[in-house]
């Protein structure tokens, strides 16, 4: 077990005292960085990048070499699991992901099975390689986060065959054939648990479940078709490895209505989008979980003074409900590819500067 130079992120997830508020950014390794685009060009395609452990390691470390971030996140894609199920994933230029064999019929659903994790070995090799690359002077720079899509979010792509504006195909199945939908979700939950456990075995020190499309569901349907299956995933997770606790984060975009339910999933932390008031979220969850978030990503297109002001507003909102511990700063969703890299430097600087100042004033 290599000691960490900076364990602030892990301590915040455990709601332990920290000297400042740690931060990382969703999609921190991405198209807003010129060095990422150069590596992707060498890889030839997005999947060529994501399925090559050496390239995945290179792009995972790029934002850490540019900014003093407090965690690394595995460079991969949420659709690796359904790809391993044989649905035929591809990425068309400018169109996003597509599955050649979506789940549309009862026969399609009956054939679905938890994939052999050996088919995802490239992901676990990347985790191990990133862990090695993070070691500097005998100590690991920051912790590494592993991740997966949620069972429901994966199902949206698996049934729709790609992205969707209205999710009418997957929702038609959910309302009309809930038995088929539950079968897909049950298999997905088993697969995601196994997938995250294999990432933990390979060296992930925290894991996150991205429920990107949970917010598309009606109240009641969310609890039955998304929340229940994230709870299943969490129940199947190894929460300790190599003598260390492995914190788990759940994030439902558009999930502000269901914070109490998310706090009861067994997760250590809840990710929040920018529509949620942090002080209210803290009161509603009763301090049972850490909170992660939640600045609007488009703030990064504003002038420096406005970015700094908005950062302070997020930190003040969290602190208003009782001190600054138990908070990981992040965006409310992934960083835009058009974000100026220098704006990210401003955000990182202000989070670290002002959160230290807040702790001093809190005594």
Curated annotation (Swiss-Prot):
Biological process terms in GO annotation: protoporphyrinogen IX biosynthetic process from glutamate
Site entry (Transition state stabilizer), positions: 77
Pathway: Porphyrin-containing compound metabolism; protoporphyrin-IX biosynthesis; coproporphyrinogen-III from 5-aminolevulinate: step 4/4
Cellular location(s): Cytoplasm
One term under GO cellular component: cytosol
Molecular function (Gene Ontology), one example: uroporphyrinogen decarboxylase activity
UniProt binding sites for substrate: 27-31, 77, 157, 212, 333
Record SUPFAM superfamilies: UROD/MetE-like
Catalytic activity: uroporphyrinogen III + 4 H(+) = coproporphyrinogen III + 4 CO2
Entry EC no(s): 4.1.1.37
Keywords: Cytoplasm, Decarboxylase, Lyase, Porphyrin biosynthesis
Enzyme class: lyase
The protein's assembly and partners: Homodimer.
Designated name of the protein: Uroporphyrinogen decarboxylase
């Amino acid at each position: 077990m290599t000691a960490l130079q900076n364990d602030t992120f892990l301590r915040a997830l455990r709601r332990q005292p920290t000297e400042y508020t740690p931060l990382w950014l969703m999609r921190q390794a991405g198209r807003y960085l010129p060095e990422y685009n150069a590596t992707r060009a060498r890889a030839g395609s997005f999947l060529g990048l994501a399925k090559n452990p050496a390239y995945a390691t290179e792009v995972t470390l790029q934002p850490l070499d540019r900014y003093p971030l407090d965690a690394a996140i595995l460079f991969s894609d949420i659709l690796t699991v359904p790809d391993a199920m044989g649905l035929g994933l591809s990425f068309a230029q400018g169109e996003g992901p597509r599955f050649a064999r979506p789940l549309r019929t009862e026969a399609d659903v009956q054939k679905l099975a938890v994939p052999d994790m050996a088919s995802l070995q490239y992901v676990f090799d990347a985790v191990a390689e990133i862990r090695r690359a993070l070691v500097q002077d005998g100590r690991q720079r920051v912790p590494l986060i592993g991740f997966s899509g949620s069972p429901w979010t994966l199902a949206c792509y698996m049934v729709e065959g790609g992205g969707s504006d209205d999710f009418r195909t997957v929702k038609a199945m959910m309302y009309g054939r809930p038995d088929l939908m539950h079968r897909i979700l049950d298999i997905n939950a088993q697969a995601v648990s196994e997938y995250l456990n294999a990432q933990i075995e390979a060296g992930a020190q925290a894991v996150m479940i991205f429920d990107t499309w949970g917010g598309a569901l009606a109240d009641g349907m969310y609890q039955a078709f998304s929340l229940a299956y994230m709870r299943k995933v969490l129940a199947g997770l190894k929460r300790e490895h190599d003598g260390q606790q492995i914190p788990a984060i759940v994030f439902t975009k558009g999930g502000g209505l269901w914070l109490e339910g998310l706090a009861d999933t067994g997760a250590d932390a809840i990710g929040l989008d920018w529509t949620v008031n942090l002080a209210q979220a803290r009161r509603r969850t009763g301090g049972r979980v850490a909170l992660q978030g939640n600045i609007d990503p488009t703030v990064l297109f504003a002038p420096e003074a406005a970015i700094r002001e908005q950062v302070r507003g997020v930190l003040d909102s969290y602190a208003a409900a009782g001190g600054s511990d138990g908070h990981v700063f992040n965006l409310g969703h992934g960083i835009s590819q058009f974000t100026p890299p220098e704006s990210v430097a401003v955000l990182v600087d202000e989070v670290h500067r002002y959160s230290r100042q807040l702790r001093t004033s809190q005594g």
